[in-house]
Amino acid sequence: MKSAHDRDALFAFHYKYVIISLYINSCIRFWRDGLRPCAARVSLQRSPHRKDVAFIKAKHGKGTVQNSRHTHSGGAQRAASLWKQVLLTLLIFIALLALIGGALWQNICYNRTHYTAEFYQIHSRKLTQSCRVVFLTDVHLREYGQDNCDLVQDIRSLAPDLILLGGDLVTYGEGSSYDNMLSLCSQLNQIAPVCGVMGNHEDELYFLNGDQALVEKFTAAGVTILRNEEARYTVHDNVISILGVEGSPKDFYNYGASVFMDAAEQQTDYDLRICLAHVPTYFTEHLENYSFELGLAGHTHGGIVRLPKIGPLYSAEEGLFPDYAGGSYGLANNATLIVSRGLGDSSWVPRINNVPELSVIDID
C-alpha cells in the first residue's frame, strides 16, 4: 500500500520529470539562439583560401595580406568557439540521457517492489449493509515480502468480506512450480472466502501443458475456481452471487459461456451480483448484455506504460492507447466495470509510470 515514503518517491520521480523537461527546453533554445547563428557567421566570414591570399598579395601589397591573416585568425577563433559550444551541448545531452535513464530505472525498480491500494465506491440497489471486496489479479508469481507476508498483512488490515481473483496468478513458461501462489491463496483463505477465475496463463498451463491438477491444487489451497460457474456467499444477511466466465471473448459461444450466462440471467434471488472475467473486452463485447452490478477484470497490466496526461500505452486486445486498461468504467447495462492494473508482470517489458494495484471495492 502507498505509504508516506512511497508518496515521496513518486514525488521525486515527477520532480525529475519536470527537471528533464526544463533541460530539453534549454537545449532547444541553446541551439536555436546560439549555435545556429554562430555557425552561419563562421560560414559567411571564413578567411580566403591560400591561392586567394597569393592573388591579393600580388595585387594589393602587404597591407591586404596582413588583413587576410587577421581574418584567418578570427575565423579559427570562431571555429574553436563553435566546437566548444558543440562539445558543451554534447555533454548536456549525455547528462540528460543519464538523468532520464536513472529516473526510468528508479521507476522500474519501484514498480517491482511496491503497489498501491486503489479504492472504489459502488452503490447497490438491494444491499441492506455495505460489504468490502478485495480484488487481486495478474500476480504472475510476484512476491511482496517473504512468502507475500507484506501483501497478506495489508489485505488482512483491510478486513474484506470477500477476496476475488482475476486470474494469471502464475506465468506460463516459467517452470511448473507455483507453490508461492498456492501459499498466498491458503493465507488469503484464512482472512475471507476466496474465489476467482483462471487467466490466459492458467488456461495455457491447463489446456496446452496438460496440467489437469491445476484447478485441484487451487481448490486444495482454499480457492473456488469458477469455470462458467456461480458461487454464492452470504455477507451481513445479503446474498452475493459471483459469476465466473472462462476464457477470452472469442470463446464465448464455443466453450459454454453463453449458455451459462443465459441460464444465470433467469435467476433473481440474490441481493448483489458480481461478474468476473479475466479480459476486460469480454464485458464490452458480450457480458454487458446481462444483469449484474459490478464487473471485475485485469489482464492488461495497466497498459504496461502509462504516459502523463495520455494514459495507458498498449493492450493485446485493443492495441495502442486502449480504452480499458485500468480504472472504473460504465457499461451499457448500467453496471460498473473495474479493470485492475494487476500486481505483477509476465513479459520482459517493464512497467513504467504504472504502479501495480490492489483493488479495494466498497459496495453499499
Where are these regions (language model features)?
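Membrane-embedded segments
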Residues: 130-216, 220-224
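Active-site neighborhood of phospho(di)ester-bond hydrolases with catalytic His/Asp-centered motifs
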Residues: 136-137, 163-168, 193-200, 226-228, ...
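Beta-strand-turn-beta hairpins that frame and shape the catalytic cleft
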Residues: 119-134, 223, 230-244, 268-274, ...
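Binuclear metal-dependent hydrolase catalytic cores centered on His/Asp/Glu-rich metal-binding motifs
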Residues: 209-223, 235-277, 283-285, 348-351
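Conserved beta-sheet core of the metallophosphoesterase superfamily
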Residues: 280-359
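N-terminal membrane-anchoring alpha-helices
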Residues: 52-57, 61-127
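Aromatic (phenylalanine/tyrosine) cluster motif
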Residues: 11-17, 23, 30, 55
